[in-house]
């Protein structure tokens, strides 16, 4: 059945044998396999070998991931499978489900089929890609699962389940009537689907996986601008003061040293509203160009009464952009990826890159054909820059790029680790304004990443 020419690796055999052993004991399985180690190849080997005589539903979390998986299986196997997306005719969906042993689809389509009365009773196995995404980041004890996973898991409650992910080491918050506590995603998933877990630690101890891990060097890059730093520091002080007042009132729940405190929603509370406004304006200043940030500040100046708005220069470039191109020039980087939170910054870096003679590409949610743009970027041998917004970066991997820049970070360890691993190995430069809360945020985040994924990253200073 298999036409693949992929090298068979010891660690893959180890994982497949683990699944085989657990299935023989009627147990479900969760596989932790780091980014870049071939979860799709593991899925291929499961479907073409271990589960070749079984009826399997494989669920991918996005339409782009579904399309890439279908392409991969078409190009590398002779597997007779079907796939369902939002454009698949409902009568054809039923026919495929009845006639094919392997079906690829998304959670939404699976849920729609179940709600329409389609039965999966003759299926044997459910494979969940990125299994961590079935959990809510903040939930009540009665509502832990992201919709539509309640109905999907219910439909497969007597079947075997295989969940796979490279990021299973975060915690999720569970809110009770009087408290909030943190729970391990891995342990919650284990309990939910009655699964045995194979972790990266076990795979590293008992297989050859280490020789296939490309360690990423994370370079932390301080940026300094007197005006911007002084404004961020002023905001830091105001936010800190409000934060401590809200903590005394019980709006903020202290989750201990190992977790970030949670701010519970208090709609209509003046202090809570001001806290949100200030943190958002700080984010603008950190992640936007000064010109755009100043516009956003001006919209809120009456309510905030901050007198130093004039300190934000009205210019067409930002200190972080200056530093970015300085490093590119110094390192003589030939192909570069830049990740930004806002389209304003994407556009500014794109224009600067064009002026400096780079082949520049920008990938946002507005781009209709991501595949074509990425293909054009990859075809260029050197002197190319691809600037990406958070919407544009979903489900992307760039194994041939050695240098990536992250203009600003978010607090979620899992999401930042996934961004860092968009490239395999190489250097990831994270820019931050020094002597501000952003510096503390970046260093705290990288400590957590290093603790959770020590085999995968090395952190160095610029």
Model-derived segments and their meaning:
Residues 411-428:
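Conserved SF2 helicase motif VI
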Residues 88-97, 335-339, 344-351, 358-390:
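Conserved helicase ATPase core of P-loop NTP-dependent helicases/translocases
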